[in-house]
Amino acid sequence: MSLNSLDLPGKPEDTRVVVAMSGGVDSSVVAGILKREGYDVVGVTLQLYDHSAAVHRAGSCCAGQDIEDARRVSESLGIPHYVLDYEARFREAVIDPFANSYVSGETPIPCVSCNQTVKFADLLQTARDLGADALATGHYIRSRANGAHRALYRPVDTDRDQSYFLFATTQEQIDYLRFPLGHLPKAQVREIAEELGLTVAKKQDSQDICFVPQGKYSDIISRLKPEAANPGDIVHIDGRTLGRHDGIVHYTVGQRRGIGVATGEALYVVHLDAANARVIVGPREALETHKVFLRDVNWLGDTPIADLPKSGMEVFAKVRSTRPPRPAVLRHADGQTWVELVDGESGIAPGQACVLYSDDSNAARVFGGGFIGRSEREPQAEEMLRRLMANADKASAA
């Protein structure tokens, strides 16, 4: 049997596709394209939170006006549309872990958790319950057949590349998901929205963390976890106490501006000592990192990660969403997985993701990745930080 444009057997009219509709232009265009090609399209929107500020705030998603926009687009396309209340699930799976992670001194990525749990687990099951052959989304990433399964690849429009936030997608989920925008540049997506007469054609793209009004995540965390706003010391990596802070929630590793101390030297946040409410600062060279240890690894390579050669596997690693993939070596031994960064990186924070690729081109395959549990700096900085933490432990025990 021949395959249709979604690599599924059968004619489009015999293929049901659930489209995850956020109310934005991307997912709306996905619904429009598939409807135009003759697929049996069903739109589903998740209500994830209900902050009153989001109702009229530009750049939000999955609440207020966005749900209404998704409904209007579905109506104009002539497709059924359902709104599912996932607010409690979103709080449990995304918002609470986000706050807990900050309290522990990490810099979390809630978008990964949302994709990993709510969107690609819960919503995928809903799509199956609706009898769908696939779940389509407006993410900028590509997938294509790889033997009996499908593999992920970076999109044509690397400026919109969302593969960093999708590294935790499991093989089972990848096989069921479809990403119709992966081969299109954003400008063309806007043009298609105009052609289809979609009311959201000129709508602003979502910005920042969707559930954080005006991007002030510290307000949300302080409300959920008041201890994150406990004051403490700002300490130089060499042991000097430089001043006080109003809560580690206001800081992240690699930060330079707004530290709150003036010493005449350029200082960066090197480490967040959550247990002792301390912000550790130091010179830029103290941020230089060549090795990161990963947890919760999702490996999508063809060879099982436990079977990697002792010499490791040459890959390209991305440790921040805004940075390009850089040369690295992936290693796995004794139950641990780590990545050695050939050129080193600065400002690597625990809780962030390290995503692995076959190369640095826009056709690179995504090999998965993991969350950064800890990292190793240059030997001198590593020893200074170790000594500083050991002294704090002794003081606490005294």
UniProtKB/Swiss-Prot annotation:
Signal peptide residue numbers: none
Chief localization: cytoplasm
Keywords from the UniProt entry: ATP-binding, Cytoplasm, Disulfide bond, Nucleotide-binding, RNA-binding, Transferase, tRNA processing, tRNA-binding
Top EC class for this record: transferase
Region Interaction with tRNA, annotated ranges: 160-162
Positions contributing to ATP binding: 20-27, 46, 138
Cellular component GO terms, alphabetical: cytoplasm
CDD domains associated with the record: MnmA_TRMU-like
UniProt entry tagged with the keyword RNA-binding: yes
Biological process terms in GO annotation: tRNA wobble position uridine thiolation
Record-annotated disulphide pairs: 114-210
Catalysed reaction equations from the record: S-sulfanyl-L-cysteinyl-[protein] + uridine(34) in tRNA + AH2 + ATP = 2-thiouridine(34) in tRNA + L-cysteinyl-[protein] + A + AMP + diphosphate + H(+)
Record-annotated membrane-spanning stretches: none
EC number: 2.8.1.13
Location of the protein in the cell: Cytoplasm
Superkingdom assignment: Bacteria
UniProt-listed Pfam families: tRNA_Me_trans, tRNA_Me_trans_C, tRNA_Me_trans_M
GO molecular function, one term: ATP binding
Function: Catalyzes the 2-thiolation of uridine at the wobble position (U34) of tRNA, leading to the formation of s(2)U34.
Stated family: Belongs to the MnmA/TRMU family.
Entry protein name: tRNA-specific 2-thiouridylase MnmA
Originating gene: mnmA
